[in-house]
Amino acid sequence: RAVARGALDLGAAGIMVAPAPGLKGDDAVLSYIMQAMDTVGDAPFVLQDFPQLTGIHISAAMVARAAADPRLVMLKAEDYPGLDKLSAIRKMESEGKMPRISILGGNGGQFLPEELSRGADGIMTGYAFPEMLAQVIALMAAGKRDAAQDAFDLHLPLIRSELQPGLGLAIRKHILARRGIIAHAALRAPGPKLSAETTAEIDHLLARLQARGGAKLP
């Protein structure tokens, strides 16, 4: 409560809530979420659906139940796979069974075109070329799905590399340093250091991306 309330006092527009691991059944999960929100009052909140981390499966029906509370304004959709859930939520909204909420994808951006085609409004994730994510969203909004997919496909090898457990952040910081966006790629201990072989592989992918027109490097 103190952390959430402190963030709101400093100007945060809302908070993000995820169910605690170990909860059993929809009623227990929903009760936890609402109790967590009640501790901070009437602030808007984002429901994070990230079962890979929490071990909690949140169904589309549970999202609809949570959305009966007007404080729920967004779903952070990171179920894997979770595309059919997005379609189910948008279908319930169109049928008047729940209010419309915003949906932002995650998971490193690896399903961005598909998430957008299923009704997501955008994405909230980390990737060393965020401008590509914005480009894909703009192209999809303009009805240019093939162009969006082409722009996205150029980056898939690097997206895959960044998603490696343990190494992902080190790879992202290496790319950001190569781009001149940050001065140093080092991670705080106990973060890993990229081997010479891994660094060479990432640099090779960056060179290919640049040669194919997907990025400009200093």
What are the functions of these language-model segments?
Residues 2, 27-31, 87-88, 135-138, ...:
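Short secondary-structure transition/capping segments
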Residues 1-57, 176, 215:
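Active-site beta->alpha loop and helix N-cap motifs at the rims of alpha/beta catalytic domains
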Residues 10, 39-40, 69, 92-96, ...:
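Alpha-helix C-cap/termination motif
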Residues 1-6, 100-101, 191:
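Helix-coil boundary/capping segments in enzymes
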Residues 117-120, 127-218:
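C-terminal alpha-helical cap/extension of soluble enzyme domains
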Residues 21-22, 81, 129, 190:
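Conserved beta-strand edge residues that scaffold enzyme active sites
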Residues 50-156, 160-165:
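Catalytic alpha/beta core domains of metabolic enzymes, predominantly
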